Amino acid sequence: MTVVDDIYELMTTKTTDESVDIEAEIDKFGESVKSLMRNEFSPETPRDDRKLRLSNIGRDDRFLWHHYNDTSSEEEIQGHTYVKFMYGHLIEEMLLFLCRMAGHTITDEQKVCEVEGITGHMDCKIDGVVTDIKSASPYGFKKFK
């Protein structure tokens, strides 16, 4: 079985392994969501966008050149886009909660990583496997086919 199968089984049966502390996991999930909302609605700390980040690895050279040389006029991010970002963060927290409830081990959440001088964060490791959690619309999934 896979993590996905285990989550579906959890949702169908509503039963967890004896080793899972249900109340502790619910509390942890609640604290994670509260932290997310605090970050969302606290004054923003400016970010240095001139630094190459791990999330840019694999991007087209032309894109990176234009990004770091500020050749485009920056569009203002609209409200619905901020909602999409928040939705993605909430989905990540919910999936990590469900993984824990299904008996999987989650470690290294948002761990700072450095590869050849480039810094980034991993989402987590699930059962020792580096995992990046993403949400996407049906349109977003089509581009990977």
Stretches with model-predicted labels:
Residues 1-130, 137-144:
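Metal-dependent nuclease catalytic cores that hydrolyze phosphodiester bonds in DNA/RNA
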